[in-house]
Amino acid sequence: TPPVYYDNTLYAGVALSENHIPGGLVIAADATTGAIKWVFNTVPQGPRDDGWEIAKDSWGDGQKVGGGVWTPPVIDPELGLVYVNSGNPSPDYDGSARPGMNLFTNATIALELETGKLAWYYQTVHHDLWDWDHVTGPLLFDVTKDGRTIKGVAAAGKNCLMYLWHRETGEPINPMVET
């Protein structure tokens, strides 16, 4: 994806492949030297990847593939966060090789700008079999609800739904009922 520039750093999402290659990446690089500052793998492969403790059991013993980042990241300098939307797990047509929820695919992910550490995530489709990942980059907005202003982030999915979260915490702005 095209990189986003902020404070002498380039932030880019990477979609390595739809199939057969582990995870998508979010990379921060020094805009002057090109030196990599940090890397976040949307499908953690082992204990060295941030988020491994949260995601490891969500793949069972299956292959950990997919999660490409197809759209540019979005930066909130006030909160010190960068937001990305991750793609579907792979293969998307046959989930038998990847039991579980398959974190952090089909998710909006907030990372700390300076370190790339996971701040929060929200997975919209668990164990996706339908290729229902997000089709847009994250959108930052402010909205007034019950008389107070909420800093929000939105994502649109291929399932024709628009998801809205609190930018700082990842909590849904409106209830999201799973059936």
Label the predicted regions.
Residues 1-179:
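Noncatalytic, solvent-exposed loop/strand surfaces
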